Amino acid sequence: MEKVNAFLKRKNIVFSAKRYGIDALGAMAQGLFCSLLIGTILNTLGSQFHIGFLTAQIGEKVPYTIGGLTSFMSGPAMAIAIGYALQAPPLVLFSLAAVGYACNLLGGAGGPLAVLFVAIIAAECGKAVSKETKIDILVTPIVTTLIGVGTAYVIAPPIGTAASAFGLSLIHI
């Protein structure tokens, strides 16, 4: 048990309510604010004040507005913010972008909640393997991404279903 504790300490993996419930959740809120909420604000400003560049569609294959693009990146922004709060090394941090995107895509209404759980799991697993091999530049992103996207595939849809059911139950009160 001493070896496990020493390894976790060396990797800065701390299992605590403060780390996950306050630090990670607070960072997630910042990621959400800097993406979804700012995107909504930009869209509203563009619509209400007829600011063309804020309402103009950009992109040919998938047309978005600036605010729409910003909102669309809420999953990656939240996951990266969570990784930052957990003091994840750079290769883990950058790999969390795909993890956050997968959570939001697969989680529907529960995407943000799925991001919280999955990003914590993926970040801690990525931290555990980081700098343990000579091919760290491959191992760390692969482990972080596969664990994160795999976990998202398993738990994000049920979280989304539960979030939708909860939302519908509130409507019918």
What are these regions (language model features)?
Residues 171-173:
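Conserved small/polar residues in nucleotide/adenosyl-binding loops
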Residues 51-53, 153-158:
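Short, charged low-complexity intrinsically disordered segments located at boundaries
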Residues 143-154:
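Small-residue-rich segments of transmembrane alpha-helices in multi-pass membrane proteins
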Residues 55, 167-169:
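Membrane-interface interhelical loops and short amphipathic "cap" helices
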Residues 2-17, 155-163:
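Short, membrane-interfacial amphipathic segments enriched in basic
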Residues 7-140, 144:
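Early transmembrane hairpin of solute transport permeases
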